[in-house]
A protein has these predicted regions:
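Acidic/polar helix N-cap motif
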Residues: 2-5, 129
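Acetyl-CoA-dependent GNAT
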Residues: 3-4, 11-94, 109-116, 164-166
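Solvent-exposed beta-strand sheet faces enriched in polar/charged residues
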Residues: 58, 122-124, 144
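Conserved beta-strand segments that form the floor/walls of ligand-binding pockets within enzyme
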Residues: 84, 88, 122-124, 160
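Conserved beta-strand-loop-alpha-helix junction that forms the acyl-donor binding cleft
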Residues: 117-133, 149-155, 162
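Conserved acetyl-CoA-binding loop of GNAT-fold acetyltransferases
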Residues: 136-146
Length: 167
């Protein structure tokens, strides 16, 4: 991630209807956090070098405490925690049947980049976002928990999903 990509995402990626809660203008502080670039936030480019998505990576311990970016290089710490991914696809690419492939590529990159040897990769999604849930299920993720989450200050029923990546 760099300033040009982060600024483009924040200023121009707008989603329609109920998906507007995912607009990156609501995530400007996070996306423009230079400390996170290359450690917790990554750009996704296609073969032609065009920006097509973003990937956010986090690690959580059993108490669901977040691991600071400064500790991401410490394999001893990260491999004792669960890897969680979040991502966004450029709005004009959504709804074209590419979601499962996109999610699998994001998960694989996160695993390889951090040399993650944990058992699961997790993610969270609002229940109303059935389009995303179907893509995640196609990518091998399964619901393991229902919860209430907050997205841009609004509460939503959410599901946590995970995919087993190691035996």
């Amino acid at each position: 991630m760099n300033k040009a990509y982060a600024t483009e995402i924040v200023n121009t990626w707008k989603y329609e209807n109920e998906y507007a809660i995912y607009d990156y203008s609501n995530e400007a502080e996070h996306m423009l956090d230079e400390e996170a670039w290359g450690s917790g936030i990554f750009t996704i480019l296609n073969q032609d070098g065009e920006l097509v998505g973003e990937l956010s990576i986090e690690f959580f311990d059993e108490e669901e405490e977040y691991t600071p970016y400064a500790e991401f290089d410490n394999r001893e710490i990260t491999n004792q925690r669960e890897l969680w991914i979040g991502f966004g696809m450029r709005p004009d690419l959504i709804g074209q049947g590419r979601g499962a492939e996109f999610v699998m590529a994001c998960a694989q990159y996160a695993i390889e980049h951090f040399q993650y040897s944990g058992e699961y990769v997790g993610l969270g999604v609002a229940v109303f976002n059935q389009r995303a849930i179907k893509a995640y299920e196609k990518a091998g993720f399964q619901v393991f928990e229902r919860t209430v989450g907050t997205i841009n200050g609004k509460e939503f029923e959410c599901v946590h999903m995970r995919k087993k990546v190691r035996e």
